[in-house]
């Protein structure tokens, strides 16, 4: 079996011009930057950061964000180099297919489906939670949770997913415009939070900055990290007692808040819909990532300075709005709650786009049924977009948030690891390819990035790893029963095209 067969870059780019499976190029670097900010400034700023401070790192969650930001910022450069060479839908899946082979590409594609399916479901679920919270703060007697006997369903995720699915069916540019307007308003709310929050900061809340490590069972509200199955894998493997705070807490906090930095890899899935992608994709990814890191660092300082991490740990589900409520600024909590509702909505749209483009790329290659990659009159895979929207909505409506969120991180980190490893491989394999952006320090920096990403994976829970392995087993079953035998590369369906045709596919 030819498990490591690879596609050439020329084949990959030429496929973008296939009739009936062509995406429309209408996005600019600014659209990509806003897209990255839209998907990243949401759950991380408004919820995950406060939870990481409460149950993992205390005020040192600032360091957790810094570690996650540095690792992610380094990984973004790997994505930027690949995206400037291969501006095609599929992101890490496509990059891997041209470097280390089909079986690894399948693993990454399957992991990306996990990442974006779980992320889309988590965020749309959070959107419903915070919509109800906003209505409560405003004094409105309304609720999106419906009960039929012992059967419970939250209709809010279904509503928000249906709305953005409809927009994306009618064109990526339309969705990007709506998303952009909402994101600008969201950024304004974030900076409002930072400015107002500084007036409530107390230096005493930063002491101790790194709380001493202690058994998780002794910390009020930390039941989620006390069990064997919920402790970080490396603690389980080394026989350590489940603990929070201290250096282990900073590292596990970094693994948790990494969820906040997943935006740029979703942006890379839109390369095929970008004008002048060799230049605009690296620029859009870089600008977006810089904005994200700055905003997260500022909000982390304000959140931990306003309220003691111990007080946050006493809350069932601490968030940024919780911090303002605890200092008596209920009026600010209402504004923040509105910002959360608005902010999480934009995240849903970008994740729906990214998930669809991953499945689209795998379908076009034949690893998934080819019918999924057909595009309509608007230059979008309309039928696939509707199917993806339906699946995300159903998962969000019926599954618990806690089960889903860590799965996002492990899927993302596994993709980051392989993309980093692929950089030096592609440098040696195809030194002739033009690169609008080059990752500095290859091969050593990409290797260090891969190691750092894998270390963050080891800080995720044992249960997350078990679920991840089960997901991979299901993926291998699909690949060996269908994907391998229907892959266009294996069937000889892919043909090289003249360089003129390739240029037309890229720039047209």
PLM regions and their residue ranges:
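Membrane-interface "cap" regions at the ends of multi-pass membrane proteins
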Residues: 1-48, 54-59, 72-77, 86-89, ...
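Membrane-interface loop-to-helix entry segments
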Residues: 152-216, 285-289, 408-418, 445, ...
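Hydrophobic transmembrane alpha-helices that form the core helical bundles
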Residues: 53-54, 63-64, 73-161, 166-169, ...
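TM-loop-TM module centered on a large, flexible mid-protein loop between adjacent transmembrane helices
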Residues: 94-95, 101, 132-142, 213-245, ...
